[in-house]
Amino acid sequence: MKYNKLLFSLLLLAVFCFSCKEEQKLQTSLDFDKVLLNAKSNPIAIESESPLFSWIIKAEGFGKSQSAYHILVASSLDKLDETHADVWNSNKVESSKSTFVKYEGKELKAATRYYWKVKVWDKSNQESNWSEPQYFQMGLLDESNWGEAKWITLTNDTRTSEYRFREYKTGRMEQPIQVDGFAASYFRNKINLNKEVDNAQVYICGLGYYEFFLNGEKVGDHVLDPAPSNYDKQAYYVNYDITEQLNSGENALGIILGNGFYGQNISWKNDPESDRDLAYGPPTVRVLLKLKYKDGTESEFFSDETWKESTGPIVFNNIYGGDTYDARFELGDWTSTNYDDSSWGFAKETAPEIKNISAQQIPAIKKLQDYEPQNVFKGSDGEWIVDFGQNIAGWVKLNVSEKEGQLIEVITTEALLTNGRDIFPGSTGGGANGMAQIYQYICKGDGQESWEPKFSYHGFRYAKIKGVSTKPDADMIKAVLVATDIQETGSFECSDDLFNKMHNISKWTIVDNVHGIPEDCPHREKCGWLGDAHAFCEYALYNYDMYDFYKKYMEDIRTQMLPTKGHNNPELKFQVPTMIAPGKRTSSYAKIDWGVATMYLPWYNYLYYGDDAIVNEYYPEMKDLTNFYLNFKGENGIMQDGMGDWCPPRWDRRTNPEAMECDPIISANAYFYDVLGIMETFAKMNNDGAFQSEMKAEKEALKDAFNKAFLVEIPNTDFKWYQSQTATVQALQFGMVPEEEIENVVNGLEYDIVEVKGGHHSTGIHGNRYIYTVLSKYGKADLAYRILTTPDFPSQTYIMNSGFTTWPERQFEWETMEGPTNSLNHPMHSGFSAYFFESLGGIKSSTKEAGYKQFIVNPEFPSQITQTKVSVPTPYGDIKNDWSFEEGKLSMTLEIPFNTEANLVLNQAELESLIINGKTFQNLQKNTKSVTLQGSNVILGSGKYKILYNKR
């Protein structure tokens, strides 16, 4: 009875305290929309010693901005107040900074959860309420945190299936050979819990792809974990919270381990005797389970030689070739607690050479969407062909009922023969790497059997399926889109259906090519070519949350760097990336136009997100690489290096190299000029005054040398250009053209496009990125529209009309060929679509206040476009611009996030006609401080504006 009275009193007290807190809520127009740590919501496995806090505020009214913030961090929720916060109390900090605010509290401990919240004040000193409590959990901060966890690998390869082998044949081999690769490994162990668990965290580092099981169920929705890396220098672990999934008493843990890129020891060998083994070693895994009990005690359970191991039904797996699954060798319910594993062996401890293990911070690869057959028909050999209607990256899943031992083989391909009668063999991936894209399933013969792969993904639209007794349908076979789960955060739509379709194809081509790295293609190579990566980076940033993705890829580039001799001074050594990162297929040192990705990716991350940490972190490497490229300077002041404007129309490096109109040295030096300016900015940010001055001088010298060497008159005209469309576009984009020559150069570009090329582009990836933006900037927007929408080769509309659903690598006249050549899914050709946001939408981040703290609004569009709607993600919230154009008037609805301002670009005539929210600019300026003038441009504070002016 006394206990009940005490409990009732405590409940009353709790209700009273809660009511008091509710009464203390402020009436405020400042509301938190998002509260993030390291750009994530409630993240686990944080390894930063000084995490970064950010928040997005929704606020009513106009011209609202932050004047101060207050952050609390505590070790528990009950300490998360101003009096008891025991980890960090920032107190009130006078600052407008609301993104990437650096933690300055006590040292954070490994594998520990912390709680935090924030409040802000606006410039009128209006105070917000505290945000809802958030948490973050630290990861394993150094090797000692792994405790006794050992690396384990398969002891015995016991595969006996005759289907463990595949054919491998490169172009240098007369006959194929049989290969099998490393076996997929199955590991299990049990743990008995006799106390109540308060928190349970599992940390798994797979060298090779893995899947994790607990008590008969797969844990999480990740596939193909973890992301690829330079495994000898950097590997990634994944953290799982399994507190709610553990049972009292016995629990069974299971791991299936595949080769991934770590154990890929087949593809990219020149011949059977080649020593180009791209594997790092046999796949291996490390597991640590950290348990905290409700009585306050802790314990660990980890991988070691006591774990049991076996092979199983996955009898072959290769990231390029595919999986082979022999269902006759299934292991039963091997992840359950009551499974008899007495026939299994014991795992072998191993010690792979790895310098660093970190938490995987990028989004995981997941199964994103299923696709049903759109058409099913028989090929010329009588086998069934399935068309899924969309070129995707992923795999197929099967649901079949056939006799025991029946082999079902699925060959995936991007294209049919031009006559449509069969799949095109040249589009199955094997021509490049020696392994055709094939999935194999061998039936156990006991009724309906369902299966999908685990350790490979392909690029395909079509599938030829052999070995089935009935016509395939949606119940039998589906395609599964599998990719890194980058979140789509931006949007674009306009009045032109062709542009909308181009935008969708560009997005598709990117999504298909993110699997822990920005790939060149999802089938033939699966490589992170640096030139491809920077070609489509900005368009990706307009559409997706790529913050962590590109930070991870920068680490891939850094860990891929090799000591390289200087060109002019071979006695000097520089750390230089290779053309490809990460992995053992490196190509050569990164030529200038590819290697500038090392500077561009941090620049874009800074420009679009405003986080200067990546600039500071990679500054030494960027500085060293800049000096390496300066060591190519010739007597004429031009760097004698370059890869070239990849894949212009009709170009083939072996049979038609002349089709590359732009000299590789010219396009490389144009990029390098831009990068010298970026490095000047980076030097200033890093208080490196000497290098800042050096970069300024080198940039000015290169501009002079570039114009002297490459700016020429076009015969029989009054115009000039830089000897190709690409170089001319680059020179205009990067500000290399002398002021007095701009009009002549623009006219020269137009002349070549219209009079010489018949209204077509002749650009590869370097020129494609900027040509439509540049034409729009210099008053030739209608010409940009013409190039894009003409139905004739080589326009984007021609490609779409040819039936492609992603952008092909090469620009050829497809109807004249037996079948499409090379890859049909290359995101380097998506880069031009940044034009839809920066020109049509008119939204660009300011270089003066990065991360869209200030941004430019300046729609530049062709007369054929009458309406455009864009949403651009920023660290402050979404910028939205919805405009329509009719009878010379531009009507715009513009939404500007809290704590930012927009620079509306106008000429004097446009300014004089300007009406904002129904008022002339002059009247509005008298009554509000949220609108100011800067030349003829108008600076707008936050809020939603209705804008109308005569567009000239």
From Swiss-Prot:
Q: Which residues form a coiled coil?
A: none
Signal sequence span is 1-21
Active site (record annotation)? 525, 809
User: Where, in this chain's numbering, is alpha-L-rhamnose bound?
Assistant: 520, 524-525, 532, 594, 826
GO CC annotations, alphabetized: plasma membrane
This chain's protein is named Alpha-L-rhamnosidase
- Catalysed reaction per UniProt? Hydrolysis of terminal non-reducing alpha-L-rhamnose residues in alpha-L-rhamnosides
Major localisation: membrane
Cellular location(s):
Cell membrane
Task: Show the Pfam families listed in the entry.
Answer: Bac_rhamnosid, Bac_rhamnosid6H, Bac_rhamnosid_C, Bac_rhamnosid_N
Q: Which UniProt keyword terms apply here?
A: Cell membrane, Glycosidase, Hydrolase, Lipoprotein, Membrane, Signal
Entry's Gene3D superfamilies?
1.50.10.10, Galactose-binding domain-like, Immunoglobulins, Maltose phosphorylase, domain 3
Q: How does it sit in the membrane?
A: Lipid-anchor
Q: What induces it?
A: By ulvan and rhamnose.
Instruction: Give the record's family classification.
Output: Belongs to the glycosyl hydrolase 78 family.
- Purpose of the protein: Alpha-L-rhamnosidase that may be involved in ulvan degradation. Ulvan is the main polysaccharide component of the Ulvales (green seaweed) cell wall. It is composed of disaccharide building blocks comprising 3-sulfated rhamnose (Rha3S) linked to D-glucuronic acid (GlcA), L-iduronic acid (IduA), or D-xylose (Xyl).
Annotated GO biological process: carbohydrate metabolic process
Q: Please list the GO terms describing molecular function.
A: alpha-L-rhamnosidase activity
EC number of this enzyme? 3.2.1.40
